[in-house]
Amino acid sequence: MFFKIFVENTVILPNPLILTKIEGLLMIEYLLKNREQIIKKMEKINDINRKEVEEKWILDNFENPKDMGFAGGDGSCNKLDYISFSFYGVGAVSFIHGRGEKVKKAKEEYIFDITHPLDIEDRIRRYMLTLELKTALYVLKNYNIDYYIFDGSLFSLLIFTKKGIEMYERELEEIYNEYGKEFNKKIDEETKSGEIGIISKDLNLELNKKILVEHVEYILTLTKLINEFKDRIIGISKTSKINIYFDKNMPDIAIFTKYTDKSGYSEPIDFVNKLGDEKKEKHKQLSSVVKGINFIKNKPFYAKIDTAYIQFVRLEDNCGVVGLTSFNKIDKEVLSSLKEISINGYPYILKKSHETVEITTKKLEAIAKLLNIDDPIARHILGKKKKKF
């Protein structure tokens, strides 16, 4: 009763601080109503058989490294929304690290431009991924390395091939027939010379067609990387939603992290061949990966993918578990060699790539100032409206 009187007596007060306080109290009231339900859900999620986890975790100190060279890279994208257009920045960077050698930068590329705000999130992400893929191709072609490491899952690259274009597969094939030969030639030239960019970005096309043309360039670049270097690329992720090892309402990476602490790995699973269609369909993420694989394996792209592996690894005791994705099994010598170039169980070149390439909003705003962009920013307009109330 006191709470109701308190609310009724203070709602009429105009002081915004009091109104904010009331909103907070109301949130707490709703939270308390759901407290027991949330606790029960957490208890159910954490109902894990520790013995089952330990049986699937193979202990290993990774003490048999080979003399290997690794390169790794990351990308970044960000945007500022103005009322007339979006100003965006995308970038990709790669570093090389051999055992006992200093880290050196192999490639760094950025694009800053303005564009129509329609589908801007997906478009700049596509630009970023295309730059990352071309950077990987350039480094693999021009440097003496054994493996190229992506910051993140390789499977996300496959999922993105189908993102938002399910209804346009016929149009994509037509665009491939129109631009495929030219794009393939230019991608080869770019990744040989190092003059990397987005070929389709500046084509004078109607916007909807242009988006599809940009997507074809992305798929062609990914297919080229897979067909030429699939045995030498690895994805390393700090997070993962996959739960095929335990089939619980908790990601496998979380289970291995919470219920093991020693260095080791899980047996890699080739889910393309070892999991039945019913189980693949049950796991939405795996189903999306398989759909992406089937899409680019067929006409007109013809990516050569026969296997796709997922496993989890902890390179050092009491460090984080990471997810490894690859198109072939990664042997223990490679894992031992990865440990040699890692800090706290994570490859240093990936950490350095992320820190180098990150395009923060603050950085983008500083670049916009250099360009003297004076168009009003959309959120500033919203802010002015709020002040009138």
UniProtKB/Swiss-Prot annotation:
Q: GO annotations under biological process?
A: DNA repair
Q: Which UniProt keywords apply?
A: DNA damage, DNA repair, DNA-binding, Endonuclease, Exonuclease, Hydrolase, Manganese, Metal-binding, Nuclease
Residues bound to Mn(2+): D74, D151
User: Where on the tree of life does the source sit, at the highest rank?
Assistant: Archaea
Q: Which residues form a coiled coil?
A: none
Q: Does the keyword Aminoacyl-tRNA synthetase apply?
A: no
Q: Which Pfam families match?
A: NurA
Q: Which InterPro entries match?
A: NurA_domain (IPR018977)
Query: Recorded GO terms, molecular function?
Result: metal ion binding; nuclease activity
Claim: DNA damage is one of the keywords in the record: yes
| SMART domains in the record | NurA
Its needed co-factors are: Mn(2+)
Under Enzyme Commission nomenclature, its number is: 3.1.-.-
Q: Name the family.
A: Belongs to the NurA family.
**Role summary:** Involved in DNA double-strand break (DSB) repair. Probably acts with HerA to stimulate resection of the 5' strand and produce the long 3' single-strand that is required for RadA loading.
Name of the protein described by the UniProt record: Probable DNA double-strand break repair nuclease NurA
